[in-house]
Amino acid sequence: MATYHHWTVGQALALFDKPLLELLFEAQQVHRQHFDPRQVQVSTLLSIKTGACPEDCKYCPQSSRYKTGLESERLMQVEQVLESAKKAKAAGSTRFCMGAAWKNPHERDMPYLVKMVEGVKALGMETCMTLGSLSKQQAHRLADAGLDYYNHNLDTSPEFYGSIITTRSYQERLDTLNEVRDAGIKVCSGGIVGLGETVRDRAGLLVQLANLPKPPESVPINMLVKVKGTPLENNAEVDAFEFIRTIAVARIMMPSSYVRLSAGREQMNEQTQAMCFMAGANSIFYGCKLLTTPNPDEDNDLQLFRKLGLNPQQTATSHGDREQQQALTEQLLHGDTAQFYNAAV
């Protein structure tokens, strides 16, 4: 059985304090011990239920408490979701992520969610969902349907968390991660840089993630996307080097996890993204929208991968992230593609 290092905040801060190039060198060494440095795993994302969320997350345009101009939508029909999944698969995707703006799914919605998972699995794709908090029974129902991954972010450190969210406790988030893991579903959990947190808070977040009974298989690191109408719309810009440091420290602390560039890539130039890959990021969401925030369009992603000589991974459903298939690689290296996913606006 694999053993994991138990990290302290002091140890994490010591990594953040290293000279940047020294930190990048260490992170790249760790990365090469566990992954092929030329491979980037690619996921697609669809918002299956948008807006009208009762939570008060200060960064989120989907909260019903803020006037952001986002139009709410009911849970999509199963057939609509499967049609989007088919289009994503035709474009080369092998993992389909479905997100719903809920505090938690209602029991009346569970049969539809189960059908979505079963339908996407029947297409030969990996499945991922982010639906808010889950009960033990809900986690097991989704696991029985074939759900591969569940995303539930911790967002920030326990100490800073109450400044950003009051409608869901930190412990609730940890409890959901435990239920997901106990049900046999792989865990996807990360956080956001740019909420107004300190470097100690970033260190605290990564310590929480790394010290879980088993670190998450995927760790999304988001850069705050400031949305007009949310309480954080006037937050200071995130320094690119500070974001890159966070990626590098995450790679060192969770050497076997996929570190994903998620929201905020639209704000990054090619050089920043390239340094994130050098720092150990090896997963992205691909296409024009990430739920309700901008994401670089697919043509820009294709061009960047070709410039950097990166082969995005296409994963085989039965073997997880590490299995390679050729279709997406060929698309990314040799030509443009149609829109990769249709995340809701």
Swiss-Prot record:
Q: Which residues bind [4Fe-4S] cluster?
A: 53, 57, 60
A GO BP term here is: biotin biosynthetic process
Name the gene behind this protein: bioB
Protein name as it appears in the record: Biotin synthase
Q: Which UniProt keywords apply?
A: 2Fe-2S, 4Fe-4S, Biotin biosynthesis, Iron, Iron-sulfur, Metal-binding, S-adenosyl-L-methionine, Transferase
GO MF annotations, alphabetized: 2 iron, 2 sulfur cluster binding; 4 iron, 4 sulfur cluster binding; biotin synthase activity; iron ion binding
Identify the pathway: Cofactor biosynthesis; biotin biosynthesis; biotin from 7,8-diaminononanoate: step 2/2
Q: How is the cofactor bound?
A: Binds 1 [4Fe-4S] cluster. The cluster is coordinated with 3 cysteines and an exchangeable S-adenosyl-L-methionine. Binds 1 [2Fe-2S] cluster. The cluster is coordinated with 3 cysteines and 1 arginine.
